Curated annotation (Swiss-Prot):
Zn(2+) binds at H77, C114, H131. Purine nucleoside enzyme that catalyzes the phosphorolysis of adenosine and inosine nucleosides, yielding D-ribose 1-phosphate and the respective free bases, adenine and hypoxanthine. Also catalyzes the phosphorolysis of S-methyl-5'-thioadenosine into adenine and S-methyl-5-thio-alpha-D-ribose 1-phosphate. Also has adenosine deaminase activity. Its EC number is 2.4.2.1, 3.5.4.4, 2.4.2.28. This is Purine nucleoside phosphorylase Rv2149c. CDD domains: YfiH (cd16833). Homodimer. InterPro entries: Cu_polyphenol_OxRdtase, Cu_polyphenol_OxRdtase_sf, Cytotoxic_necrot_fac-like_cat. It comes from Mycobacterium tuberculosis (strain ATCC 25618 / H37Rv).
Amino acid sequence: MLASTRHIARGDTGNVSVRIRRVTTTRAGGVSAPPFDTFNLGDHVGDDPAAVAANRARLAAAIGLPGNRVVWMNQVHGDRVELVDQPRNTALDDTDGLVTATPRLALAVVTADCVPVLMADARAGIAAAVHAGRAGAQRGVVVRALEVMLSLGAQVRDISALLGPAVSGRNYEVPAAMADEVEAALPGSRTTTAAGTPGVDLRAGIACQLRDLGVESIDVDPRCTVADPTLFSHRRDAPTGRFASLVWME
């Protein structure tokens, strides 16, 4: 069991028809052995499956939900978004975004540098979780998730978004041609790293994208996965684990 929920950062948004809960874990408080120590929640990185299952059970208990009410994805850096409306015992394959209108159904994203995007409309009672890496963000996975939310009755003016911990532009060096390519698909993302080289700030680009689509309530977790040792980072430590970001409604 977790010693306490101090390993989990919580945030609430809105109280119109439902309460929105958002959680981001750290790497502390689990049972995984190095290099996945200790609260690894990714089941695709080479960790002991029993350890991952134990960590996921701890997470579900810590947020007060049965294990099958935490919905996971087998993420592939694509743009597929799935609507979920009931508990699941297995992850959704080849999926990078989840949307639900069902209360007490937590949508989970696992990352170690990519951007976890947690969106919700508390008035309409609709939530979404998106895994937005460079490739998925370029393909429009965040836009796809927003479109599904709107199709269910969400209103752009009522949607709040949290962009969770991810690699910062200061630490995300890429070739100049790649930075230009990402900028073309995601304006506002091209930047310069701390070393003065071409870089990408995915969260800046996604925030610009959401604002252009009419989303005004956007919060960005300031933590950089590469710089913060309490978080998993593939760029810094590969092989390593994954932390989770979740959103659900009560």
